[in-house]
């Protein structure tokens, strides 16, 4: 892929999005970045302050609830990386009754804008592993392993699940199915279903996923509940470093032989294993027993698609935890001792 190419990144001011824009600019790409509101100084300032932003970054205002707004940002781009997703339903919007309808309509509109542009050849959609639960459809237990063939059975109720995550799981699952239905129909579609991401951040606050990842260290009951929800949904916890997440997106963007669905995580482990690692490597951090629950579950990680195409993860569990902990301390969030 020509490094002079233009790449559109939706949801560019988010946790993954900001790192992705930074790396794309570093590699010489011109980036069309969308934000919900160009009137937010912190988000605009973050992106405008990146190296090479002055010459190769163009910002566009676009909301997932206003689909036509993305067309201008997509025009003249060769690739679109679609990270933007509605986390909470806009109650002022009467066109969609929930986040699932908005997310599905959003990816459909993005694809249609890509096709109308006549310049976009590839769409990389940032999915989530919450759409790939290895639970049996009847809720009787888990399959032996999780891979790209797994789809979360939306007819089931999930342990530790509240209304927010019920809606999130449904919206990510339905939106991913929708975007993949366009693969090979005038555009190459890659859905990169990422695990829980940790590491560093460019934002001025701890990203939600990182806060969840280190919730055992900080004794944060609310975020630990989310961690356990993901473990009960997926069998174990798939995690990866932010730098690996960014590299995987660019790898899928630049590799013309990749399309379809790909799961993305460097580690797949029990939450009890995370606690055990922390207690071994950071003996000064005491984790309360209520944050250590061993499921004894042995669900395997069966996805090798990304590695078989030549991708290599560079960050292991030790580095993910180390960088997440360092970032949290920098933000003033210190583990309970």
Language model region names:
Residues 2-31:
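N-terminal Rossmann NAD(P)H-binding glycine-rich loop of SDR-like oxidoreductase domains
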Residues 82, 86, 91-168, 190:
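Conserved Rossmann-fold NAD(P)-dependent oxidoreductase catalytic core, especially the SDR/UDP-sugar
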Residues 216-262:
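Alpha-helical substrate-binding/gating segment
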Residues 246-296, 300, 325-328, 332-337:
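Mid/C-terminal beta-alpha module of Rossmann-like enzyme folds, strongest
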Residues 242, 292-312:
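Conserved C-terminal active-site "lid" loop/helix of NAD(P)H-dependent oxidoreductases
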Residues 185-187, 199-214, 252-262:
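Glycine/proline-rich active-site loop of Rossmann-fold NAD(P)-dependent oxidoreductases
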Residues 38-105, 117:
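NAD(P)H-binding glycine-rich loop region in Rossmannoid oxidoreductase-like domains
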Residues 127-128, 175-201:
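Conserved beta-loop-beta element that borders a ligand/cofactor-binding pocket
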């Amino acid at each position: 892929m020509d490094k002079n190419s233009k790449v559109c990144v939706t949801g560019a001011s988010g946790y993954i999005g900001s790192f992705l824009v930074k790396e794309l600019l570093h590699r010489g790409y011109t980036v069309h970045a969308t934000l919900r509101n160009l009137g937010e100084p912190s988000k605009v300032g973050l992106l405008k302050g990146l190296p090479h932003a002055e010459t190769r970054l163009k910002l566009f205002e676009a909301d997932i609830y206003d689909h036509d707004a993305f067309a201008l940002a997509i025009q003249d781009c060769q690739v679109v990386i679609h990270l933007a997703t509605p986390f909470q339903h806009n109650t002022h919007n009467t066109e969609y009754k929930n986040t699932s309808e908005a997310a599905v309509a959003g990816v459909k509109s993005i694809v249609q804008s890509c096709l109308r542009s006549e310049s976009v050849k590839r769409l990389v959609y940032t999915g989530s592993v919450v759409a790939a639960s290895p639970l049996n459809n009847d809720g009787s237990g888990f399959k032996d392993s999780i891979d790209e063939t797994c789809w979360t059975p939306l007819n089931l109720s999930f342990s530790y699940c509240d209304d927010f995550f019920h809606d999130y799981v449904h919206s990510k699952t339905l939106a991913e199915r929708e975007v993949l239905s366009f693969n090979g129909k005038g555009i190459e579609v890659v859905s990169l279903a990422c695990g829980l991401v940790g590491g560093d951040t460019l934002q001025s606050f701890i990203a939600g996923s990182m806060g969840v990842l280190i919730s055992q260290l900080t004794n944060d009951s609310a975020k630990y509940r989310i961690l356990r929800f993901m473990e009960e949904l997926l069998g174990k916890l798939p995690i990866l470093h932010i730098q690996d997440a960014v590299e995987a997106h660019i790898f899928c963007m630049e590799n013309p032989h990749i399309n379809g669905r790909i799961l993305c995580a460097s580690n797949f482990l029990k939450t009890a294993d995370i606690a055990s690692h922390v207690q071994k490597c950071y003996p000064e951090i005491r984790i309360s027993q209520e944050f250590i629950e061993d499921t004894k579950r042995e669900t395997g990680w069966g996805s090798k698609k990304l590695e078989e195409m030549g991708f290599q993860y560079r960050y292991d569990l030790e580095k993910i935890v180390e960088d997440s902990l360092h970032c949290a301390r920098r933000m003033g969030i210190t583990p309970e001792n």
